[in-house]
Amino acid sequence: MEIDIKKIANMFDHTRLAPDATLAEIEKLCNEAKQYGFFSVCVNPYFIEAAKKFLSGSNVLVCTVIGFPLGQNTIETKVFETKDCVAKGAHEIDMVINISKLKEGDVDYCVNEINEIKKACNGALLKVIVETCLLTPKEKELAAQIVLKSNADYIKTSTGFSTAGATFEDIEIFKKVVGNNKLIKAAGGIKTTDDLLKMISLGANRIGTSRGVELIEGLKNK
């Protein structure tokens, strides 16, 4: 199989969301993203402005997270966070859905929450994290149906801060429900180039990982 490394690198959100991340680490993240041609860097809101500065003059976008990592904030809080992040220069917002409401089957609440946040995005792209490791297969299907009904751009598997990351089953279920109507981001736990390539073949459009450099270097040796 012919592997287009440049194309795959441009599917990566190069991620550093650890609570102890330092400014020097964010600068390194941004430099790697420029060097490898990653699509974006994903950083906590505090580092949006620094990342914008480090990426100045490049095509790499800034992605951030809201309601992260538990999703348990009120809609009003998530909307405020979103507006603040967009004002500070974020191009993409990865929100965590209210997982309690999702598991209760409250579709109206979840769709409304996503749509209120999308309005606050003011044109920024919105990805909805549903934390698949906490969901049954039926709940994963429901999560995908909710995102399909909403104005979000992407459904995303995981925060990387819960019990597990993306699985092949997650991507298969999402793809079956959303088809080509929404995009899919696989995040967390993608450790090998084989996992990476399988996620993409199953329908992942974007990859969230802190191992971007390692994975691309691995592809070069394939």
Curated annotation (Swiss-Prot):
Pathway(s) where this gene product acts: Carbohydrate degradation; 2-deoxy-D-ribose 1-phosphate degradation; D-glyceraldehyde 3-phosphate and acetaldehyde from 2-deoxy-alpha-D-ribose 1-phosphate: step 2/2
GO CC terms: cytoplasm
MF term (GO), any: deoxyribose-phosphate aldolase activity
Active site: 94 (proton donor/acceptor), 156 (schiff-base intermediate with acetaldehyde), 185 (proton donor/acceptor)
Keyword vocabulary terms for this entry: Cytoplasm, Lyase, Schiff base
Family from the record: Belongs to the DeoC/FbaB aldolase family. DeoC type 1 subfamily.
Name of the protein in question: Deoxyribose-phosphate aldolase
Gene encoding the protein: deoC
